Amino acid sequence: MAPRSVTPAVLLALALLGAACGSGSEDGLRVVTLGDSVAYDADPGIRAALEAITTGVGSGVEVETRSFGGIGLLRPGFDDYLAEVLDTQPDVVTLMLGGWDSDKAMADPESYRTRVDEVTRRIIDTGTFLVWLGLPPTPPEEDAREHLILVNDLISSVAGRHRNVAYIDGSLLGDARGEFTRTNIAVDGTVQQVRKVRNGEDDGHLCPAGAALLGEAVAEVLLIRGVVGVEVGDPEAGHPQGEWWTGEWTLDPRYDDPPGACSG
């Protein structure tokens, strides 16, 4: 079943792309994840989900995670950062950005839309498929809702104009109304903490259960793209850590930064 965060138009575009691409090459599918500190927390979950997939030729998916804090489309060094990635000729790039750009995006939305389109074209013109990850809801105390909605709307509108681009709505980490929530229904159907706690207050960064939800959404998009094999999460996937959402990656030190962040 397709995730609720993927629009029907995107699913149709991905299905058409999958028909053109077939089942992948003998070298497997190469994916690079890019983004800021929230994406950094998402990276292990995305990698675990994707590496639990086998392609049609059984060669699997290789994921390189390259997210780090403080990066944005308008931040110094972004173009060089992107160039380094594209030089490796990935098949797929995932991109979650915008938090560090929000003030300038609010000041001049059309200029930011142009920048999003420029970066999008730069990626897909190399033959790479792009998955934009929308920014997830932020805690009300951060007073960033208006900024987040604007940035996500600009990115999703650009994504919708390009055939080889998918947009995944970050509200999949939210509650039934798409608003911030510390806990949510996890991949395995249980209620788990998906967002961090910092100094006793809600924080926008991710816990393993939140990272796994994003990983599942990306994996399902790429399955529709034409990566065939077992469905993500199936125990028969042959993932070395068993059920991918409970693997060793969930013990990564980033999920205990600050200490106790994901046990509150």
Regions found by a protein language model. Give the residues of each.
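Extracytoplasmic/secreted cell-surface and envelope-processing proteins
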Residues: 41-42, 101-109, 139-146, 176-179
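Bacterial signal peptide processing site
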Residues: 22-24
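Active-site segments of SGNH/GDSL-like serine hydrolases
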Residues: 99-100, 121-152, 171-172
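C-terminal motif of bacterial Sec signal peptides marking the signal peptidase cleavage site
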Residues: 17-20
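Extracytoplasmic/secreted proteins, especially bacterial periplasmic and envelope-associated proteins
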Residues: 33, 41, 45, 80, ...
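Bacterial N-terminal signal peptides that target proteins for export
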Residues: 1-10
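Conserved SGNH/GDSL esterase-like catalytic core that processes O-acyl groups on lipids
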Residues: 28-114, 241-264
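Catalytic His-Asp segment of secreted/periplasmic serine-dependent ester chemistry enzymes
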Residues: 140-264
